[in-house]
From Swiss-Prot:
PANTHER family: DFG10 PROTEIN, POLYPRENOL REDUCTASE. Belongs to the steroid 5-alpha reductase family. Polyprenal reductase subfamily. This is Polyprenal reductase 1. GO terms for cellular component: endoplasmic reticulum; plasma membrane. InterPro entries: 3-oxo-5_a-steroid_4-DH_C, Dfg10/SRD5A3.
């Protein structure tokens, strides 16, 4: 449902995802060096590097190291991603949840069955009533489904914010490229926008109307707002099986990511140490970057829970796959170069694929 002032939101999001995904796909293709393939891969590798993969080697000159440092930021700035993600997701979640509560409840009105019977008794308008009723109910489900998916996203960014502060111990020398940093900030704004893109226009219009009414009438003339907790939560429990399958996939991926992050967090007991060891346990026994694999599972769960009806959600998922796969391959190469005894049976991110 498009609303004046917001008609281009979904196309803009799709274009933004294409612009960020396409260079990664092109860099992964076997383009000859003469055609610029090697240069593009080196640029993308530099932009996506962080932590151990961005640290200059001891053999590099001090001038080269200082030059590289100009285009990097501390890896502990990862926290900025999740602060931005929490803010963006929370604002959208509260706005759309409020809109759904005020305009999209009850999800299944008790009178609907009686109205349908009456329409059949009347006869002439039964089919048109059924079509309108079906569209209305379908739209209500869509809005509440968006609330459900935003709740999953909120859980994800809140957990990642906690882990960044309390689980990971970034080395003082760990850096990430400024382009990767800006891409991360973009991602944690665009991701919740994509998950809610189809509902944002109407929710924004409703909230604007409420604010305008408040300004004109004043608080004394506005009706009292009474929040019924059952009406706030009950529609979420009446969503379809697709949402709950998506939630189960999301939880499965989250549990494995929690374990893998805990393993990574304990590799360096001393925060000032730069020493790296081979991680083992959980999905690390299969792939080099199981926390990335878990991220793919998490966002696949969100895609399933969303119903897959909105194109920006698909573009978001494609970006997650390409971005994390590219980064995982670079990390896998680093492990193989760093450790002579690194298990050759491990894949980069997806078992039996890459």
């Amino acid at each position: 449902m498009e609303t004046e002032g917001w008609p281009a939101l979904q196309p803009l999001l799709c274009l933004a995802w294409i612009a960020t995904t396409l260079p990664i796909i092109v860099a992964a293709l076997p383009i000859p060096a003469a055609a610029g393939g090697h240069l593009l891969r080196r640029l993308l590798s530099a932009f996506s590097s962080r932590g151990k993969t961005v640290r200059p080697s001891p053999a590099s000159s001090s001038g080269s190291s200082s030059s590289k440092a100009k285009f990097t930021v501390p890896q502990k700035y990862f926290m900025h991603f999740y602060v931005v993600g929490v803010l963006a997701t929370t604002i959208l979640l509260l706005a759309i949840w409020f809109y759904a509560y005020m305009k999209m409840t009850p999800l299944l009105p008790e009178s609907s069955s009686y109205s349908t019977i009456a329409s059949h008794l009347v006869g002439s308008n039964s089919f048109s009533f059924g079509r309108v009723h079906s569209r209305t109910m379908g739209h209500k489900y869509h809005v509440w489904r968006t609330v459900f998916v935003l709740l999953l996203m909120e859980i994800q960014v809140l957990r990642r914010l906690y882990e960044t502060e309390h689980v990971f111990h970034y080395s003082p020398s760990a850096r990430m490229h400024i382009v990767g940093y800006l891409t991360g900030l973009f991602y944690y704004v665009a991701a919740p926008l994509s998950l809610a893109s189809s509902c944002i226009p109407e929710a924004a219009e409703y909230l604007q109307g409420q604010v305008a009414e408040f300004i004109v009438k004043g608080r004394a003339r506005m009706p009292d707002l009474v929040i019924d907790s059952s009406s706030l939560l009950q529609p979420l429990l009446k969503l379809g099986w697709t949402q709950w399958i998506g939630a189960v996939i999301f939880i499965w991926g989250s549990l494995h990511q929690i374990r893998c992050h805990a393993i990574l967090g304990t590799l360096r007991e001393h925060k000032d140490s730069d020493e790296y060891v081979i991680p083992c346990g959980d999905w690390f026994n299969r792939v080099s970057c199981p926390h990335y694999l878990a991220e793919l599972v998490i966002y696949f769960g969100m895609l399933v829970a969303s119903g897959g009806e909105d194109i920006p959600v698909w573009f978001l998922f494609v970006f997650v796959i390409t971005n994390l796969s590219f980064a995982a391959v670079e990390t896998h190469k680093w492990y193989l170069q760093k450790f002579e005894d690194y298990p050759r049976s491990r894949y980069a991110i997806i078992p039996f694929v890459c």
